[in-house]
Regions:
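Extracellular low-complexity, Gly/Ser/Thr-rich intrinsically disordered linkers
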Residues: 439-511
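Primary recognition of N-terminal secretory signal peptides and signal-anchoring hydrophobic helices
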Residues: 2-10, 20-153, 158
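A cross-domain feature marking catalytic cores of carbohydrate-active enzymes
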Residues: 160-162, 186, 223-227, 267-269, ...
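Conserved, mostly hydrophobic/aromatic
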Residues: 182, 223, 265, 295, ...
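Substrate-binding surface in catalytic domains of secreted glycosidases
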Residues: 192-203, 270-430
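Short, well-ordered coil/turn segments that N-cap beta-strands
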Residues: 152-154, 178, 217-221, 259-261, ...
Length: 511
C-alpha cells in the first residue's frame, strides 16, 4: 500500500511538472478564452480569464461538465469530489490533498464576488484531465484521460437518514469517497403500503440522489423501509399472502416512481424486540421469509420489464435472539446481502459503562460475551449465511455515561446517568466529538482496549465515559472483513461523520 501511495505521489508530481513545461499562450488580450471538455464548450456566467500568467475558469460549470461536485467546508476551505475521489483545497493556498495524499498547485484558487475560480492547468491535472491549448483559437481543450480509481471489491453501504437534512447535512456532502450504496432512511408503511417517511425532506433528497447517480452511474441508491420507529406494521404486512403481495407491489411502485435501485428491508424486529408498542407474533419467523420471497419475486418481475437490476438487502439485528427468530439460511438465499447492525451492544438503557461496538469479546469480562461483532458474525455463519452476504456494521457515533467510577479508567463501571450529547443524551456523533475536541482533549483521555479492538474516552473530573469508533478501530474492522471473506461494511450513519474522517479511513482500508 505504501509503495502504491508513493507511486501516486510521484506520478502526480511528474505530470504537474510536465504540464508546467508547456508554455501558457497569452492569447489575444481582446478575445475571450474558451474552455471545452471532450469537444463541447463549457458555458459559464463569468468568462475564463488570466491572472499572473494562469488561466482561471468558474468552478461549478467546469465541475458539472466533468462529473465532479464542490462542497464548502468553511469560508475558504472546500472539497471537490466524485465517487471514489476527493480533493481538499483552500482559497488562496497552493496546498491540496488528493484522497488524503499531499498534492501541490502552481496557482491557488481564488474567490471573486463570492464565486470560486480554479486554475485550469493545476486543477485539471488533479481531476485526471488532459490539457491542450490552442493559441490561434484562444481555447483550452480538456479531455478525459479514461483513468478512474478502481472500485473497491467490497460493498461500502452508507445509511443517510432524512433528519440529517434538518441539520443542513445534505446528501452531496457524503456521496464521494468510495460509497457504493446509499440507503435513504426511512420510508414508512401506511395501510400496508410503502409511503414517504418525511415528505418535507424526501422529495428534495430523492432528487439529489438522482443527480448524484447521474454524476456517478456506479452509485446505487436504495430506499430503506421501516427502521426502529416505523416497524410496527411489519407483522401485519407479513401475515397473509394478500398483505404480502400488496406490500411488495407498493414497494416496487415506490422504487420505480422515485428512481431507486432497490429496497432495504429494516424490520426491527420479527417475533420480539423493538418498540414496546410494536405488534409481534411467533409466526413472524416464517412470515418474514415469505415476505422477502414475495418482494423478491415482484422486484424480479419489474427487473425483466424495466431492464434494471433491483436489489433487496435487509438490515439485521446483532443479537442471538434475532437469529433464533428468523430463518436466516432461507433469507440469505433470497436477499442480495445482509446489513449487520453490529453496534448498540450496550447503551443508554443500561447503568454500566461498556463498549457499544466491540469487535471481539473479552474473556476476562463475562458480560461482554455475545456482545461483539465477531459473536454476531459467528452466529450468522452458523445459521447458514454465506460470509460474502454479510456486511459488517460500523457506527459513526458513540454512546456515553457520566458519573462513572474511576476504576479501569471508567470502563465497566457503575454510572449515575447519561452524558450530555449534542442531539440527545448519551449519544455522541463522531463529528461532534471532533468539534468539541474531546478526543484526547478538554479533560478527556483516549484509552484503547486491545482485546475488543475499540477505543474509549474518559474524563476523571466528571466521570464521563464515551464508547465510540475511530480510525484505528475501523482499520481492525476492515481487516476483519477481509480475513472473514465478508461482503463489506455498512455505516450508520454517514451524516454523523460530517468531517469525513471515518468514511475516508473506511474506504481506504477496504481497497
Amino acid at each position: 500500500m505504501n509503495r502504491y501511495r508513493t507511486l501516486i505521489r510521484t506520478s502526480l508530481l511528474v505530470l504537474v511538472l510536465a504540464l508546467l513545461l508547456l508554455p501558457m499562450p497569452p492569447g489575444n488580450a481582446d478575445s475571450e478564452i474558451k474552455v471545452t471538455y471532450n469537444g463541447t464548450n463549457i458555458e459559464s456566467q463569468t468568462s475564463p480569464f488570466t491572472r499572473n500568467g494562469a488561466a482561471y475558469v468558474q468552478a461549478r460549470p467546469l465541475l458539472n461538465a466533468v462529473g465532479w461536485q464542490v462542497q464548502w467546508l468553511d469560508k475558504t476551505k472546500f472539497k471537490l469530489f466524485r465517487s471514489g475521489a476527493a480533493i481538499d483545497m483552500e482559497v488562496g493556498k497552493t496546498d491540496a490533498a488528493l484522497n488524503g495524499n499531499t498534492a501541490s498547485l502552481v496557482h491557488a484558487p481564488i474567490l471573486s464576488n463570492s464565486t470560486l475560480f480554479l486554475p485550469i492547468r493545476s486543477v485539471s491535472t488533479l481531476l485526471g484531465l488532459q490539457v491542450n491549448w490552442s493559441a490561434a483559437a484562444n481555447t483550452v481543450a480538456l479531455t478525459a484521460t479514461g483513468t478512474k480509481p478502481a472500485p473497491s471489491p467490497y460493498r461500502i453501504v452508507a445509511y443517510y437518514p432524512y433528519w440529517a437534512s434538518y441539520q443542513k447535512l445534505g446528501l452531496s456532502s457524503f456521496a464521494a469517497s468510495g460509497i457504493t450504496f446509499i440507503n435513504h432512511a426511512f420510508a414508512n408503511i401506511r395501510e400496508g403500503e410503502v409511503v414517504m417517511g418525511d415528505v418535507a425532506t424526501d422529495r428534495a433528497n430523492f432528487a439529489e440522489l438522482k443527480q448524484l447517480k447521474r454524476s456517478d452511474p456506479e452509485l446505487k441508491a436504495l430506499i430503506s423501509v421501516g427502521g426502529w420507529n416505523w416497524s410496527a406494521p411489519f407483522s401485519d404486512v407479513a401475515l397473509t399472502a394478500a398483505s404480502r403481495t400488496k406490500f411488495a407491489i407498493s414497494a416496487v411502485r415506490f422504487v420505480r416512481e422515485h428512481g431507486f435501485d432497490g429496497v432495504d428491508l429494516d424490520w426491527e424486529y420479527p417475533v420480539s424486540g423493538g418498540l414496546s408498542s410494536n405488534r409481534t407474533r411467533p409466526d413472524d419467523k416464517q412470515n418474514f421469509t415469505l415476505l422477502l420471497r414475495e418482494l423478491r419475486e415482484k422486484l424480479d418481475e419489474a427487473q425483466k420489464k424495466d431492464g434494471s437490476k433491483y436489489l433487496l438487502p435487509i438490515a439485521a439485528g446483532a443479537s442471538s435472539s434475532y437469529v433464533a427468530n428468523t430463518e436466516m439460511d432461507k433469507a440469505a438465499s433470497i436477499v442480495d446481502w445482509i446489513n449487520l447492525m453490529t453496534y448498540d451492544y450496550h447503551g443508554s438503557w443500561e447503568k454500566t459503562s461498556n463498549h457499544h461496538a466491540a469487535l471481539y469479546s473479552d474473556p476476562n469480562r463475562p458480560n461482554s460475551f455475545g456482545a461483539s461483532a465477531n459473536d454476531t458474525v459467528s452466529a450468522f455463519l452458523k445459521a447458514g449465511v454465506p460470509p460474502g452476504k454479510l456486511v459488517l456494521g460500523v457506527p459513526f457515533y458513540g454512546r456515553g455515561w457520566t458519573g462513572c467510577g474511576a476504576a479501569g479508567n471508567g470502563l465497566a463501571q457503575a454510572c449515575k446517568g447519561l452524558s450530555e450529547g449534542a442531539t440527545s443524551a448519551g449519544l455522541h456523533e463522531f463529528g461532534n466529538l471532533e468539534k468539541q475536541r474531546w478526543i484526547g482533549g478538554n479533560g478527556f483521555v483516549r484509552y484503547w482496549d486491545d482485546v475488543a479492538k475499540v477505543p474509549w474516552l474518559y474524563n476523571k473530573m466528571t466521570g464521563t465515559f464515551i464508547t465510540y469508533e475511530d480510525p484505528e478501530s475501523i482499520s481492525y474492522k476492515a481487516d476483519y472483513v477481509k480475513a472473514k471473506g465478508l461482503g463489506g461494511a455498512v455505516v450508520w450513519e454517514v451524516s454523523q461523520d460530517f468531517n469525513g474522517t471515518l468514511l475516508k479511513k473506511l474506504t481506504q482500508a477496504l481497497k
